[in-house]
Design a protein with these regions (language model features):
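Non-catalytic, conserved peripheral segments adjacent to functional cores
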Residues: 1-101, 122, 127-170
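Conserved metal-binding segment of the jelly-roll/cupin
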Residues: 98-121
Length: 170
């Protein structure tokens, strides 16, 4: 696997090694021994969301959970935002195309707001977490918060009530 730093402090982009032949493709998404070189976190929960085109989930995060995210099917526009006041990249954001073709993964430390916008008819978004979900411990950054100046490839995404309300950063 290839690992590289991103523009946001502590965020890693990871590309697993792929093996392709006439039968298709094989790749190892996660091996705890290999990931020991990338993070000391132990993942305890896996989650999947399935979304149709232009559904936007996020931006969500908390200050205690490390996440490993990827798209297993389709194409997603992943936008992440640094909401850690102590971080040298606080208030900055970065976007990535995650897809079943590039199989890129993002390792997100606590305090990073995480979102995925479905760009294909259907996406399957997969993420591992090193803590169990805790109701009421998450933050939501509003997708169109003017202080962040996010760029999205669509102007009217499909949002949940939670994401529609969101929260603005002071």
């Amino acid at each position: 696997m290839k690992v590289k730093d991103t523009k946001l402090w502590g965020v890693k982009e990871i590309v697993p090694e792929r093996f392709c032949d006439f039968r298709g493709t094989y790749l190892e998404l996660y091996d705890s021994k290999k990931f020991e070189t990338v993070t000391d976190k132990k993942f305890v929960q896996d989650d999947i969301s399935v979304s149709s085109k232009h559904v936007l989930r996020g931006l969500h995060g908390d200050f205690r959970t490390t996440k490993l995210v990827t798209v297993l099917k389709g194409v997603g526009y992943a936008l992440i935002a640094d909401n850690r006041k102590e971080s040298p990249t606080y208030g900055k954001w970065e976007s990535f195309t995650l897809s079943d073709q590039n199989m890129k993964m993002l390792l997100l430390p606590p305090g990073i707001g995480n979102s995925i916008l479905a760009m294909s008819n259907e996406i399957i978004y997969f993420y591992k977490q090193d803590t169990h979900f805790a109701e009421g411990k998450q933050f939501t950054i509003k997708w169109d918060d003017p202080k962040w100046n996010f760029w999205w490839p669509v102007t009217s995404p499909i949002l949940s009530m939670r994401d529609e309300k969101g929260g603005y950063v002071d």
